[in-house]
Amino acid sequence: KEPGVFQAKELQLLQTILDNQKRVPLTLSLGDMGITTDIVSKIYDWAKPYATEGELASYIPELANVDPDKSAIVIGDLQGDMIAVGNGVDVKVSIQSVVKPFLYIYALQKGLAPSDISYIEPTAMHFNTDAVLQPESHKSRPGHPLNNAGAISSSGAIDNFDDFLAFMRCLTGNPKLAVMEDVYLSEMATNANNRAIAMRLVATG
């Protein structure tokens, strides 16, 4: 179907859940939730044309080098079953901000109190704003753990990177998870804003 006219009846279960404000138990399998390869393929085919409307992230030079024609949808359940469709299924990608909830979980497991990391509240500020402390609201911590300031605050719990990497491999079930050196070096060369955020957090204790 043409972009914009896809009825997405395959998402009926999800819509019903949202309408009824119910939650799908995490123990359910993909099959139990009615998620099939055919459904995911139809969603992918509908969404793919929109991918050309976006832009590569040029603020990190290495990310501007990825192939914009590659895309994929990958869904897994806690039973280890996985559905993967698209021409980018085998492409190794940088997880970028997807690491933020993992960082928060790691910090909590290491004994940091939520109140020591950040507030947990909505914010209208950009994800990488350097206005991390919101003094006009008399707030001395990041607004929530899923913006850059909150994630940097969570990363204060890391005193051994190998330990954090082992944690990530365990939590994701991916023993091959590794640092992408080219992306790391590219980020290190352009991360002045994040360094500024870190210094402001250090200055406030």
Model-derived regions, located:
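"Short basic amphipathic alpha-helical interaction patches in structured regions
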Residues: 86-92, 99, 118-122
